[in-house]
Amino acid sequence: MANTLPPTDRSCDISQPLERLSPDESLKAESDYLRGTIALGLLDRITSAVPGNDIKLMKFHGIYEQDDREIRDERRRQKLEPAFQFMIRVRLPGGICTTERWLKISELACAHGNETLRMTTRQTFQFHWVLKQNIVPLIRGLHEVLLDTVAACGDDSRGVMATVNPQFPALQAELAALAKTVSDHVIPKTRAYHEIWYGEERIASSEPEEPFYGQTYMPRKFKIGFVIPPNNDIDIYAQDLGYIAIIGENGKIAGFNVAIGGGMGRTDKAPHTYPRTASVIGFITPDRLISVTEAVMGVQRDYGNRADRSRARFKYTIDDKGLDWIKLAIEDRAGPLESARPYDFTSNADIYGWIESGDGFHHFTLFIENGRLNRDMLDKIAQIAHVHKGHFRLTPNQNLMIANVATADKPEIEALLRETGLIAFNERSVLRLNSMACVALPTCGLAMADSERYLPDLITKIEGILTRYNLQNEPITLRMTGCPNGCSRPFIAEIGLTGRAPGKYNLYLGGGFHGQRLNRLYRENIGEPAILETLNEVLGRYATERLPDEHFGDFTIRAGIIREVTEGRFSND
């Protein structure tokens, strides 16, 4: 289409010489399409680390270099390098995992990791504590079941999410297939991954190696998700690009509302950074998914800020250019969007226990606290995997669904859940069932405080407060991270906690119950006593002053406890 866009400032985007942009842009451009010197670094047995630039490039391969931060000082005193190890993330569109793949992933975690698996808030697996010499065998093991880690991290399209709601089995299957199609389309095309990890020989070609991404890929990560109302389990408003399924009168997917510009990360004491909820800009039919996805990503690729990585996410491009300009830019590439169609969300939580989908199948959602599966849990779930004829689904809330259990097979699965004790995992408080935490310490290099290891104990103490006020059955969303980057999406929780220092957190209140509204900072840099004292006061008021069926986040705004956040850019006011 002819370019009819009004002029815009392009002083920080891909049109500029590399020397004017972030050093990461030169790194990508000079990496030979993500090859770098990764293959050579893997052969170096003198160090358990990889060379500096390759650390960043390996993220595009789904790999993060980390170290055990709790023994870092001691190793320094002993004149030893840090205890380096790697986190490896699988690409798993829609969180769908066959039983064969589950068993292989469990095997690899025990053989090459620390005998645990982490299910993430983006419906995939992470291996932790993988040593450098074990990366290749682990990745080749994944390849045996046709899984990989391509673009699970890095400046590209991350894993594509999709609703896990078996109440609409045909729609869910269609949505999962569309998510897989989009995921396959936006994955980087370079053969670097196959050459480095599978030993594939490089073959010269006259075709462009990255026809969409080019040499410098995206300015920052780009997240895509699909959702079927009324359950906003994937937190559609936290996605860079979200597709909200609209169901037609015939009961099939008529198309999608398009939501753009969501994102959770911020930096403390940096008011130019903030979380943002996505804006709905229109409606498209299913046949336009690929062209619109390319258009949206292409606008961010071409106009995103590549000079300042703290402002490189799509949310900032939208706010800098203006939503109307961005929509024009998308339509200039993909054609006009129709007006958005009505939809309604009621919750972003999982539905635990058995659900019958009406097509002869049953589905059991199992609570996995903070997504962490230890060796005992892996062994118990393996017993189910060996007999289960359906598949597994990883939920966006870090839980596990045993999906597509035939009526005739349900008694056997139920018996195994009881014999192994797994079924008791669901016997938790409503607050705990609605909680999430990121990994944080001791491995995440960005964490400033504990999260996964600390939240369970903190919840136990908050449960006492809820019981005191007879609120133990109230669904309240609580999310914690070890830093403000927001991996567990804390900025749309009714209660959000983000780490500031060991034992210290920022406390946020006022998020929307189904993820539709950002929360706001209420108390800054406080420890556990102040957290509990503050929540005791606010929950006490909620118990006595709330309206019928009023959610906690809504109450804190109506009662004047916290000011509503209407736009992310105003959340730091």
Swiss-Prot record:
This is Sulfite reductase [NADPH] hemoprotein beta-component. The lineage of its organism: Bacteria, Pseudomonadati, Pseudomonadota, Betaproteobacteria, Nitrosomonadales. NCBIfam families: PRK13504.1. It comes from Nitrosomonas europaea (strain ATCC 19718 / CIP 103999 / KCTC 2705 / NBRC 14298). It holds the Pfam family NIR_SIR. Alpha(8)-beta(8). The alpha component is a flavoprotein, the beta component is a hemoprotein. Component of the sulfite reductase complex that catalyzes the 6-electron reduction of sulfite to sulfide. This is one of several activities required for the biosynthesis of L-cysteine from sulfate. InterPro entries: CysI, NiRdtase/SiRdtase_haem-b_fer, Nit/Sulf_reduc_fer-like_dom_sf, NO2/SO3_Rdtase_4Fe4S_dom, NO2/SO3_Rdtase_4Fe4S_prot, NO2/SO3_Rdtase_4Fe4S_sf, NO2/SO3_Rdtase_FeS/sirohaem_BS. PROSITE patterns: NIR_SIR (PS00365). The gene is cysI. One of its GO terms (biological process) is cysteine biosynthetic process. Keywords: 4Fe-4S, Amino-acid biosynthesis, Cysteine biosynthesis, Heme, Iron, Iron-sulfur, Metal-binding, NADP, Oxidoreductase. Siroheme binds at C487.
